[in-house]
Each structure stands twice: as structure tokens, then as C-alpha cells.
């Protein structure tokens, strides 16, 4: 499993310590950018991305929960982003243009699905994605309850990838923790975005929190059984 800590959940008073630790242990940094319109919250910014970039060597994945993603792509490229992750709900009528713009800036393309958005919504450009993320909670806030129906969506993405010979990673955003790791792996997840319940709330010390998380993931991995689709 790959791990992508969500920086909206980190302790900003320990910014340097936690960024440096995550950089030496994780696979990605997950950075949520919200505009207060697409979701009812405001979080991180292109400036924040630029500050993380000063300390980070691992890829910075910027999740755009904004109504106008086209306004952020060039800013985030300048700030040092490596991935731009887009919601199909916000790119209708400009999906191909925005994906091409991300590529022109030498960044990778992520697509992310809200719980109620079907995989079919990105049928005509799914092959252009480097990573596809499934929201397993309603977007906008940390610490929300897991939506079990999303396990079928993960299994659908895995089957689509195999059927079409695609190579995108399958990522999960929302309530990735001890209670869900086994089910998520069984359904086809490759990457966990970990936040409050999965990482940062385990201990004051990031080193100890990471140790606890890793032990939980390894224990879940040993119990994984194939996911059975629900009716």
C-alpha cells in the first residue's frame, strides 16, 4: 500500500517537523484546496503548496475542491505541485482542455469522484488519468463517517482498469483507518489518504503515530479477502 497523508489534518504548529518526517516515510503529500463554494469550507492554498515544496521531495498531490479549477492550474504549477486532482463535477465542457493544460505544465492528472458520482461520469477521459480517487465520505471536512457503498465503486474501478489495460492508481479519500483498511484493500485500493483517524490522532509524536498506523495496515493486509459486490 502507498500512503498519502492529508496535510489539512496535520499540526501546523509542527509544520517543519511533520513535513520532513512525512517526506521520509510517505509516498505522496495530499493537499486539499477548497474555495468555500464547491464545498462549504476553506483550507489550503497555492502559497501553502510552495512552502511544503521547500521541504518535500515526495510528490505533492493537490485536490481541487473548487468551482473554477482552471484558475488554479498555472498557480499550482509555479508553486511546485506534481499532481492536480480534478472533480468531474467541475470540469464538464472543459475536461480535455484542462487535462491537456496540466500535462503541458509537466504535472500528472488525478480524477476524484464524490460519493454520488458514478464511474461512468469520466468514461471518455478515464484513460488520461494517472490516479483515480474515490471519496468515501462527503467532501469538505475531516473526520466524517465512512460510506460503505463506495467499496463497490473501488471494485468497479479495479475491474475497469483490468478490462481496458489501464495503469491508473486507485486511491481512497475519507475514513481510511483501522476500521476500514481491510475492506478497502479487498476492494482494490492502492493508496490510502490518511488524516485524523488514520494517522494524526494516534499520538502527539508523528513518529509514534506512524508506527501505530503501519502496524494497523500490516494487520489488515494479512486478513484481506476478495471483495464481494453488494446487490
Curated annotation (Swiss-Prot):
CDD domains, A to Z: RPE
Claim: Nuclease is one of the keywords in the record: no
Chain positions recorded as a divalent metal cation binding sites: 30, 32, 63, 173
Catalytic activity: D-allulose 6-phosphate = keto-D-fructose 6-phosphate
Single GO cellular component term: cytosol
Active site positions, chain numbering: 32 (proton acceptor), 173 (proton donor)
Entry's Gene Ontology molecular function annotations: allulose 6-phosphate 3-epimerase activity; D-ribulose-phosphate 3-epimerase activity; metal ion binding
Signal peptide per UniProt: none
InterPro entries, alphabetized: Aldolase_TIM, AlluloseP_3_epimer_AlsE, Ribul_P_3_epim-like, RibuloseP-bd_barrel
Top EC class for this record: isomerase
Record family assignment: Belongs to the ribulose-phosphate 3-epimerase family. AlsE subfamily.
Purpose of the protein: Catalyzes the reversible epimerization of D-allulose 6-phosphate to D-fructose 6-phosphate. Can also catalyze with lower efficiency the reversible epimerization of D-ribulose 5-phosphate to D-xylulose 5-phosphate.
Name listed for the protein in its UniProt record: D-allulose-6-phosphate 3-epimerase
Lineage of the species this protein comes from: Bacteria, Pseudomonadati, Pseudomonadota, Gammaproteobacteria, Enterobacterales
